[in-house]
Amino acid sequence: YDRKETYIHVNPNDGDEKRDVLYTLGINKSGDFKMYKPCFSAKEILNDGCQDAVMGFVPLIIDYEEFKDGDDIVPYGSRIDKPRQIVGQLKNGDYYILTAKAPGLTFQTSRDLLKKLDVPFAYDLDGGSSTQTTFFDERLTPVYRDVTGRKIPTIMTFEPIEIA
């Protein structure tokens, strides 16, 4: 680990803990999601054409196939029901968000649901206090930690576009 290199997985709010087992979700200039294995540097991700990146946990579905390695990467939360925030992209390029409130879903239950929905790609951002979803002015997920929730340095926004 070269401290001169900026890693997406270093979160200064968590004491600069290097999360070298988590995957990064990149978003390229066309708006397509791209998955990066642990320890890709921010420079490498930018050089690969991504303009944004989000660190959550792990992919659940890649190219329509279940990604089960995440169960061992995140053993403290993968095998028990937990609130989930899952984002993905459909074959036509549309995004989707799957929000599961408490008691939540396991990774496997999430994968089973996503497979039934025939999604090509799904990424678990987290759940509980680490992610919050607001749809227009309505909060879909409750605050699970403190009064205002955990301070999260990353925000993803999805804005509707009009199709002519």
Specify the residue positions occupied by each region the protein language model found:
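Gly/Ser/Thr/Pro-rich low-complexity, intrinsically disordered segments
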Residues: Y1-A164
